[in-house]
Swiss-Prot record:
This is Glutamate--tRNA ligase. It comes from Vibrio vulnificus (strain CMCP6). It is found in: Cytoplasm. It holds the Pfam family Anticodon_2. The keyword ATP-binding applies. One of its GO terms (molecular function) is ATP binding. The gene is gltX. Its main location: cytoplasm. InterPro entries: aa-tRNA-synth_I_cd-bd, aa-tRNA-synth_I_codon-bd_sub2, aa-tRNA-synth_I_CS, aa_tRNA-synth_I_cd-bd_sf, Glu-tRNA-ligase_bac/mito, Glu/Gln-tRNA-synth, Glu/Gln-tRNA-synth_Ib_cat-dom, GluQ/Sye. GO terms for cellular component: cytosol. Catalyzes the attachment of glutamate to tRNA(Glu) in a two-step reaction: glutamate is first activated by ATP to form Glu-AMP and then transferred to the acceptor end of tRNA(Glu). ATP binds at K243. A motif ('HIGH' region) lies at residues 9-19. Keywords: Aminoacyl-tRNA synthetase, ATP-binding, Cytoplasm, Ligase, Nucleotide-binding, Protein biosynthesis.
Length: 474
């Protein structure tokens, strides 16, 4: 048997953290078993669907690297198939027409609640029975699935263990509306059957749907897949995850400067574990992933942990990979990397200091863009009269360099200190402000080497002009 999983979001909003984790688990399980992963868009809610949401889901999946083997399939393109299966159940008396109006059903529900009964559809209720018997062909009706009245549905959830639901707790589900459109629970079953889905991995909010769907699988003569229901994700305060906890769309994490590999690593650990290991390569995730290692308990979303992982991956990933994802942020800032050193060299030098790609993009502009003003606080502190001579000596020495290497630039700074009998801080900080425009950067000799001789010379001259103007206005 080839394992086949699916991710089946509804296009009523963006791909959020919970959905992304479900997609990741489904993708990982398929990969770990040498199987296939299907993407299906469950767009039967015609009033709430949007193309914008479809695009956002596809973009989020692609950004996370969760490529699908089949799809995306759209349920709205399969209505003929669903109706064929509804008609099959009608012909076999496993479904029936119900003519009870919404108003009548509301009235019956109110009676049940008044009698302290569980509100549910009851085909044998005298009022509902009378409405169905009085109906004529052509009157508006829904189609209901004839749920078994006896026994119970039992299934072995791969995360939660044995689950049993009595059929007496389930009413006859509507499988086709009065407008002729099929309903969610029915479409899902037909899709999973037609697409050969063997394992359904989804959120625990679907547990109540599962016994209903199992009865429909069996009525259709379809194989019942294996189910695994994941616990919800909570905020770090124990409340259901919401926007105030940082529960934003996947692409907003892109916008905030997270790497897909970091978000995937974080999401896989929100419920699944392998000993105490925290860092997992994609290959390790695939090789180690199993459904029975997913916890039944809810997981708490911790932004600090995600940030720590992101910093780890910025520091340790192939600079080419970081550069690929940094490019979007550079484009937002109008930074063109053809105007300076190789971006991979800059990432190697600066990346370790950054928790996000936004921080990284903010810190590397001076490698590629000239500036016409220094950071006010840094200039006030370090571009003073006392820095004039050290900068002048440094300028002469860098202009005279024939080999522009980090080692030679380091020696220039050391020679300035020796020649003027000053400490490193007397030249290092003024030089840093001069060549970067600010007071923070990696080692200034390495920064100068990447910026290049022409720019370094021009910027030291600009700093000297700034000092001269400052002294003139003092």
């Amino acid at each position: 048997m080839t394992v086949k999983t699916r991710f089946a979001p509804s296009p009523t909003g963006y791909l959020h953290v919970g959905g992304a984790r479900t997609a990741l688990y489904s993708w990982l399980y398929a990969k770990s078993q040498g199987g296939e992963f299907v993407l299906r868009i469950e767009d039967t809610d015609l009033e709430r669907n949007s193309q914008e949401a479809v695009d956002a889901i596809l973009e989020g999946m692609q950004w996370l690297g969760l490529e699908w083997n089949e799809g995306p399939y759209f349920q709205t393109q399969r209505f003929d198939r669903y109706n064929e299966m509804v008609d099959k159940l009608l012909a076999e008396d496993k479904a029936y027409k119900c003519y009870a109006s919404k108003e009548l059903l509301d009235e019956v529900r109110a009676e049940q609640e008044a009698n302290k009964e569980m509100p549910r559809y009851d085909a044998e209720h005298p009022k509902i029975k009378a409405a169905n018997e009085a109906a004529k062909d052509g009157d508006p009706c829904v189609i209901r699935f004839r749920n078994p009245k006896e026994g119970s549905v039992v299934f072995e959830d791969q995360i939660r263990g044995r689950i049993e639901i009595s059929n007496s707790q389930m009413d006859d589900l509507i499988i086709r509306r009065t407008d002729g459109s099929p309903t969610y629970n029915f479409c899902v079953v037909v899709d999973d059957w037609d697409m050969g889905i063997t394992h359904v991995i989804r959120g625990e909010d679907h547990i109540n749907n599962t016994p209903r769907q199992i009865n429909i699988y069996e009525a259709l003569g379809a194989p019942v897949p294996t189910f695994a229901h994941c616990a919800m994700i909570l905020g770090d305060d124990g409340a259901k995850l919401s926007k105030r906890h940082g529960a934003v769309s996947v692409m907003q994490y892109r916008d905030m400067g997270y790497l897909p590999v970091a978000l995937n690593n974080y999401l896989v650990r929100l419920g699944w574990s392998h000993g105490d290991q925290e860092i997992f390569s994609q290959e390790e995730m695939i090789n180690l992933f199993s459904l029975n290692a997913i916890s039944k308990s809810a997981s708490a979303f911790n932004t600090d942990k995600l940030l720590w992982l992101n910093n780890h991956y910025i520091k340790t990933s192939d600079p080419e990979y970081v550069a690929e994802h940094l490019q979007w942020h550079l484009d937002q800032k109008g930074i063109k990397t053809e105007n300076g050193p190789a971006i991979t060299d800059v990432i190697k030098l600066v990346g370790e200091r950054c928790n996000t790609l936004v921080e990284l993009a903010d810190q590397i502009g001076y490698f590629y863009q000239d500036f016409d003003a220094f950071d006010a606080d840094a200039a006030k502190k370090h571009l003073r009269g006392v820095a004039k001579q050290p900068l002048e000596v440094a300028l002469a020495k860098v202009e005279a360099l024939t080999e522009w290497t980090t080692e030679n630039l380091h020696q220039v700074i050391a020679d300035v200190c020796t020649e003027l009998e000053i400490g490193m801080g007397k030249i290092g900080m003024p030089l840093r402000v001069a060549v970067t425009g600010g007071g923070q950067s990696p080692s200034v000799d390495a920064v100068m080497q990447l910026i290049g001789k022409e720019r370094v010379v021009a910027r030291i001259k600009m700093a000297l002009a700034f000092i001269a103007e400052r002294e003139a206005n003092a």
